[in-house]
Every structure is written in C-alpha cells, then in structure tokens.
Amino acid sequence: MRAGSLAVACLADVPDAPILGRNTAGVLAALRTPDPGQLYKYHLGRLDWVDELVTSHGLRRATSAADLEAAHAAGQPSIVGDVEGLDFLEGKLERLEEAHSRGVRHVQFVHYTPNDIGDFQTGGITHQGLTSFGVEVIQACHRLGFVCDVAHATEDMTKQAVKVATKPLLLSHTALSGSPAMGPTPLTERQVSRDHARAIAETGGAIGIWHFFPSLDKYVDGLKEMVDVVGVDHVCVGTDQQVAPGSLQNYSQWVHLVAAMLRGGFSPEEAGKIAGGNYMRIFRAAVG
C-alpha cells in the first residue's frame, strides 16, 4: 500500500471461503452446503486475524469518515473492515451488531453461497431477488452505519434493494456488460447491464470497476465506458485484488492509475472522484 501511494483499502473477510472451489466447469462456486455455524465461526476467526494484522503492521482501522480523511492527510495506510457475503448471519441480525462492534464498516450481502438475503449472479434463482430478511438486513445496516454493497447480487435483487435503501448503495467490483475494453472474458455473469448500473446511480451510489482488463489503458477505457452510462459521480475503482490481479498485479502498481486516467482524458477532478472521492462520499453518507 505504501509503495502504491494507497491511503485506504477495504480488507475483506470472506465467510464462505472454506466451502469455495472450482466446480467441474472450472467456475468458482460453493462446493457443498456449510454446516450450521461453520461460516460464522470462520468469520469470527478472520476478524481476529484482521485485529492481529492491524497491530503487527501498524495499520490504522478506519471506522468513520474522519478516520479516512486523517489517513489520507497523514499518508498512513489504513483499512476499512469489509465482509464479502453475509452468509454468517444465518438469520440473526444481532451478528451484524457484533460485526460493527469489531470494526466492520462495509458489508456485501451475497457472494457465491446461497443465503437467506437474496439471489447472486452466478447461482440459481431461488428468491426472485431480495428476501424479506434481506429488507431487514438493509434497514439494520443503515441504522448501524455500514456501506451497503450489492456486488454479486442479481439485477432483480439490486433493483429491489434500491427501493428499500435510504442511503447510497455501492456495487464494488464489476464491469459494463459486453465491455469492448475488457473483451472476451469468463466473467460475463459478473458484469452488469446499463439498467443495473443506473439503478445504483439513482441512490447516489457508485459502481466500482475492477481492473480485470488486458492493460492499464484498457482499464481506463473500462472506467470511461461506465462513466458514459452513469456519469463520473457514480464510478469508482474496485479491485478484488487477490482474486483478479488483471492489469495491476498488486497494490504497489496502483500508483500508476491516476497518471493513466489523466493520459486517457480524465480531468484531475474526475480522476480524484473515481480514485477515491466517490467512495469517500458514500462512506460518509452511510457510516458518518
């Protein structure tokens, strides 16, 4: 992070990681149904790991907008506690409160494992979108102060979440469906349509474009594609760094992104919004 001039990164706890793997088609998926309590136990262990990482590496933990601003001003790497998939809830909203007390401020509702919140893009349709429990989860997230992330959610689930949301939503890592800049990709199911993206923008939120592109310049083109659909106030970077290294192999290379955006035609103000300003605005509105 220091080498890449990154002030803040979302450090994801992935509760369904113990049951994920490649299926016979080579696609990442849940390979079995988790045992009761298994993903909750794993989630708690990952929160312990984050605590140790923060202490051992001298990182800051950002739990408020003021913390993000201080991290940027000081140039000291900070992390936002993030959970990628609320599979560990198992119908228990009090576990959200526990996660908040442990420093988590960013939650993604679904991932690769069926849960009781809603449908995900790479799985079968079982809920026809957002469930009644999912509605309660969104309301609780707003009350507690979490960034609400609808990455991996189906278009139907996303549009139903938009109707419930009273704060900006984030879709943290994707690309525009049929992106010419990305070209042929095994990630087609994870791309989003123009209507899908516009629904997020209507909440005041943003769509994060991951960097799974052939080159850095193509990545900038991918950012432009989404800006053309929803406007520069509703686009941000979304790394999924360990899973999709793409055009930027590690965090140290992110120092080159802003220069590439300027070279590609973005103004300094526009580049600032995409590189962090839009996420900061959403974080402030959601977390405080």
Residue ranges, per PLM feature:
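Short hydrophobic/aromatic-enriched beta-strand-loop microsegments
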Residues: 168-174
